[in-house]
A protein has these predicted regions:
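Conserved HGGG/HGGXW glycine-rich cap/lid loop of the alpha/beta-hydrolase fold
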Residues: 10-63
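Conserved alpha/beta-hydrolase "nucleophile elbow" surrounding the catalytic nucleophile
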Residues: 27-29, 89, 93-95
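Conserved acidic catalytic loop of the alpha/beta-hydrolase fold
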Residues: 72-89
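Flexible "cap/lid" loop of the alpha/beta hydrolase fold
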Residues: 102-151
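Conserved alpha/beta-hydrolase catalytic His-Asp/Glu region
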Residues: 125-128, 132-137, 147-212
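Short beta-strand/loop motif that positions the catalytic acidic residue
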Residues: 214, 220-222, 226
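Conserved alpha/beta-hydrolase "acid-adjacent" motif
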Residues: 227-233
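Catalytic active-site module of serine/aspartate enzymes centered on a nucleophile-bearing elbow/loop
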Residues: 244-275
Length: 275
C-alpha cells in the first residue's frame, strides 16, 4: 500500500499486492479500493499481481474540489500505472470504474500498456437520456440523486446499499448486512464535493468514441437485474461499439453482482484472464 502525488498535487492511495501478471481494479461510485478486497485476495491466490486504488476524492485519496471529471480520472490512473511500471496489465472496472477504464484504455492504453479490459455493470456508452440516447435515464433521476445527497449524504448512502445496489429490495432477497455496512463505511470516507461532482461525471460523460478506439479484448459483463445502470442502455450497446468484445449477461444478478455472486463472477473473470 502507498500513495502517489499526481500533477495537481492530489494524493492517490493504492494497494499493490503480489507478483505475476498485473490486474488493476477500478471501483464504482462512491466507494474505494476496498470494494474489491474479495477479488484482490482471490486473484492474489491465483498467482496474479493485484492493484486497486481510491479515485481522487474517494476513500483515502485526497479531497478533490475541482477536476472531478473522467479525463482527470484517466490521467490519474495513467500516473499510477507509470509509477508502478505496469505493462500489459488487465484493467477491470465496475460501474463508474468501467467508465474510467474505458477512457483510460482509449487515451493511455496503447503501446502494450493494456492487454485486456473488463467492463462490469459499467456506465458506457452514456447513462443520461437525450435525443442521441433515447433509452437513457431521464436527467430527473440524477437531479433526484443530487437532492437526496444534499439532504443527507449518510441516509442516501444507506438507502442505496440496503436497496437497489445489491438487489436487497427485491421480494425474498436476503440482506447481507455486512455488505451494506461496508458500502456505507467506504462511501462516507470520501469527500462530499468530489462525490457530488461525480454524479454529473458518471451520468453525462459520453464514451461512444472511446469505445470505438479500444483495440484490446474486452469482457462486457452485466447483471440483468441491475437497478443502477439498466442493462438495456449499457452493456449491449457498448459491446457493439467495441472492436473485440465478449458480452455476458447474468439473469437476475444485481448491480453489485461481484459481491453477491463472487464464485460465478470470479470464475468468469479468471477464464477471461487466462484465455
Amino acid at each position: 500500500m502507498g500513495t502517489i502525488t499526481v500533477k495537481d498535487g492530489t494524493e492517490i492511495f493504492y494497494k499493490d499486492w503480489g507478483k505475476g501478471p498485473a490486474i488493476v481494479f477500478h471501483h464504482g461510485w462512491p466507494l474505494s479500493a476496498d470494494d474489491w478486497d474479495s477479488q484482490l485476495l482471490y486473484f492474489l491466490s491465483q498467482g496474479f499481481r493485484v492493484v486497486a486504488y481510491d479515485r481522487r476524492g474517494h476513500g483515502r485519496s485526497s479531497p478533490s474540489f475541482t477536476h472531478n471529471d473522467m479525463d482527470t480520472y484517466a490521467d490519474d490512473c495513467a500516473a499510477l500505472v507509470k509509477h508502478l511500471g505496469l505493462k500489459g496489465a488487465i484493467h477491470v472496472g465496475h460501474s463508474t470504474g468501467g467508465g474510467e477504464v474505458t477512457r483510460f484504455v482509449a487515451k493511455h492504453g496503447g503501446n502494450g500498456v493494456v492487454s485486456k479490459a473488463v467492463l462490469m455493470n459499467a456506465i458506457p456508452p452514456v447513462m443520461v437520456k437525450s435525443d442521441k440516447n433515447p433509452g437513457g435515464l431521464p436527467i430527473e433521476v440524477f437531479n433526484g440523486m443530487r437532492a437526496s445527497f444534499i439532504r443527507s449524504r449518510g441516509q442516501f448512502y444507506r438507502d442505496i446499499a440496503s436497496g437497489p445496489f445489491y438487489g436487497f429490495n427485491r421480494p425474498g432477497a436476503k440482506v447481507m448486512q455486512g455488505i451494506v455496512d461496508d458500502w456505507w463505511r467506504q462511501s462516507m470516507m470520501g469527500d462530499a464535493k468530489a462525490q457530488y461532482d461525480c454524479i454529473k461525471t458518471f451520468s453525462e460523460t459520453d464514451f461512444t468514441e472511446d469505445l470505438k478506439k479500444i483495440q484490446v479484448p474486452v469482457l462486457v459483463m452485466h447483471g440483468e437485474d441491475d437497478q443502477i445502470v439498466p442493462v438495456a442502455d449499457s452493456a449491449p450497446l457498448a459491446a457493439k461499439l467495441l472492436k473485440n468484445a465478449t458480452l455476458k449477461i447474468y439473469p437476475g444478478f444485481p448491480h453489485g453482482m461481484f459481491a453477491t455472486h463472487p464464485e460465478v463472477i470470479n470464475a468468469d473473470l479468471l477464464a477471461f484472464f487466462k484465455s
